[in-house]
Each structure stands twice: as C-alpha cells, then as structure tokens.
C-alpha cells in the first residue's frame, strides 16, 4: 500500500520534477509528487506530498535523508520531511528519549536510528544535532515508545561500539514539558523532539531540539489552503543546544588561574597599602 511523506520549506521554483530529481539524487525512487497550491491564486503553498511504494520505503527515506542538503536548491536548503496520516488523530502515546553523546562526524540521522531500531523495535527516530553550518555537534537523540526498551538500550548500549568510530555515551533525556495544543481539522503524526533536561550527578544541563530546526504539526482539510492554515510551526534553534558534559582542558584552566592570580598580586603590590618595615613601624596616615 502506497504511503506519503509531507515535505516543506519549498521555494516557488521547486516543481514536481525538481522534487523527484532531488530524491533520485539521494538514491530514493518516488511514485509521485503533489505540489499544494492556493486554489484561488495558484501560487505554491510551500509544501508538497511525496508518494512512495509502501510505508516501509517512506519510513526508510524519512530517516535516511531528512535534514540533509537538498540537491540543486538555491539558496541552500535541507530536506524537511514528516509523516502523513490523513484524517487520523495524532499519536499522543508517551515517548521516552535518550541523549547520545560522543558521536563522530560521520554519524547521521539514519545511522543513529538504524543502530537502535534493529534491536529495539519501538525506536521511532534519531536526530544528530548540527551547527549552523551543517556540521555535527557530536551528540543527538533517539526516541522510543516503549519505556522498557529505552531502559534496556541505556544499559545495553552504554559504551557500545559500531556507531561511528567511538563508543557512545548515553543518558536519559526527559521532556521538559508535554505541550498538547488543540488543532482544528484533521491532524498529522508529529515526528519531533522538544526541549529536554539531561540529568547527571549534581546538575541538570538543558537543551532543546526540534526536527530540522523546528517542531511542527499540521492539518490538511483540503487542497487550496495556505501554508499558514495547514501548518503550525514552532522554532527552537540549534544554537540553544550544548553538550551537557563538555571536555575540560586542565592545563589551560590552570594557566588561566595562574594568570589571574598574578594580576591580583600585581594589583595588591601597586596599591598604597604597602607592607611595614618592622612590626613596630608607625602606620602611615591615609592621604
């Protein structure tokens, strides 16, 4: 049975042929592309639906290329994909996420997802966090719908090898707040990561993430509506993200400490409170 993906952030020049070629360049074959247009003006609404042979193919494509550079796009853009479930209510089942650290630059979303889903079927997605230039920050998230599998993965995959060239570092990521907003019309499956807290021994380190710089859900009543009607979009930039356990350069820290200490010593020596010659010396009057 055919299945579709939603694709957003399109430029007006991106027609059906452009989208099909972009997927083909990434090694993916699509059955059809439907560009959504305003039914009154005929102007593209900025998004489309891409049809695949079956759900498995669509899901594989989503995890493989979502967030990667879009071939031929000017200015440069990235694939922005999401699941589509026409007329169905959103899946509000609980989600259990893990923070994955010490990722090497070669690890992408698809590799992160495949590493976990082959052992833990409830894994629903993986996201490697990128900086503004598209380079990995060295960490990401994986999401599960089964809490037991999340806990198993945390224990069984801690320090595991096979994902990139370094052992992975795992910790539980807890959603900061579950925000369920009422959306009119039919609703689509939300494939997103919200804000998380990362708990370690003595502190919380906070970061946020949205799928490809955004967490979105959208409704689709009929063709011809504008994009603002179809999609509610919430921006949370990647610049708010940071590794909760950065490496400490002890040598550099000691150097800075000594430099600051020398500055303090010099300042004290230059002030008017000079040491006395002897214990019995008279204390000079203040000027």
UniProtKB/Swiss-Prot annotation:
InterPro entries: Nucleotide-bd_a/b_plait_sf, RBD_domain_sf, RRM_dom, SECp43_RRM2, TSAP1, TSAP1_C. GO terms for cellular component: cytoplasm; nucleus. Residues 3-86, 96-175 form the RRM domain. It is found in: Nucleus; Cytoplasm. The keyword RNA-binding applies. SUPFAM superfamilies: RNA-binding domain, RBD (SSF54928). Keywords: Cytoplasm, Nucleus, Protein biosynthesis, Repeat, RNA-binding. It holds the Pfam family RRM_1. One of its GO terms (biological process) is selenocysteine incorporation. GO terms for molecular function: tRNA binding. Involved in the early steps of selenocysteine biosynthesis and tRNA(Sec) charging to the later steps resulting in the cotranslational incorporation of selenocysteine into selenoproteins. Stabilizes the SECISBP2, EEFSEC and tRNA(Sec) complex. May be involved in the methylation of tRNA(Sec). Enhances efficiency of selenoproteins synthesis. Component of the tRNA(Sec) complex composed at least of EEFSEC, SECISBP2, SEPHS1, SEPSECS, TRNAU1AP and tRNA(Sec). Found in a complex with tRNA(Sec). Interacts with SEPSECS. Associates with mRNP and/or polysomes. Found in a complex with EEFSEC, SECISBP2, TRNAU1AP and tRNA(Sec). Belongs to the RRM TRSPAP family. This is tRNA selenocysteine 1-associated protein 1. It comes from Pongo abelii (Sumatran orangutan).
């Amino acid at each position: 049975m055919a299945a579709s993906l939603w694709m957003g952030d399109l430029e007006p020049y991106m027609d059906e042929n452009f989208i099909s070629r972009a997927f083909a360049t990434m090694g993916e074959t699509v059955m059809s592309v439907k560009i959504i247009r305003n039914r009154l003006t005929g102007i593209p609404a900025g998004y489309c639906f891409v049809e695949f042979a079956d759900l498995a193919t669509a899901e594989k494509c989503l995890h493989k290329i979502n967030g990667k550079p879009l071939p031929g796009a000017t200015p440069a853009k990235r694939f922005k994909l999401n699941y589509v479930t026409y007329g169905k209510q959103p899946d509000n089942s609980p989600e259990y996420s893990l923070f994955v650290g010490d990722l090497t630059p070669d690890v992408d979303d698809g590799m992160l997802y495949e590493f976990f889903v082959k052992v833990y079927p409830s894994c629903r997605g993986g996201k490697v966090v990128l900086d503004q230039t598209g380079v990995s920050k060295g960490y990401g998230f994986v999401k599960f719908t089964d809490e037991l599998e999340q806990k198993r993965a945390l224990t069984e995959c801690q320090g595991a090898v096979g994902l990139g060239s370094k052992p992975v570092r795992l910790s539980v990521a807890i959603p900061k707040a579950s925000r369920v907003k009422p959306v009119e019309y039919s609703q689509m499956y939300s494939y997103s990561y919200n804000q998380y807290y990362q708990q370690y021994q003595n502190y919380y380190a906070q970061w946020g993430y949205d799928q490809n710089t955004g967490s979105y859900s959208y409704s689709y009543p009929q063709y011809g509506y504008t994009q603002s009607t179809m999609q509610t979009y919430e921006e949370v930039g990647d610049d708010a993200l940071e590794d909760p356990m950065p490496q400490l350069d002890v040598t550099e820290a000691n150097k800075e400490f000594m430099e600051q200490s020398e500055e303090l010593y010099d300042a004290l020596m230059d002030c008017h409170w000079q040491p006395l010659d002897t214990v019995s010396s008279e204390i000079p009057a203040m000027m």
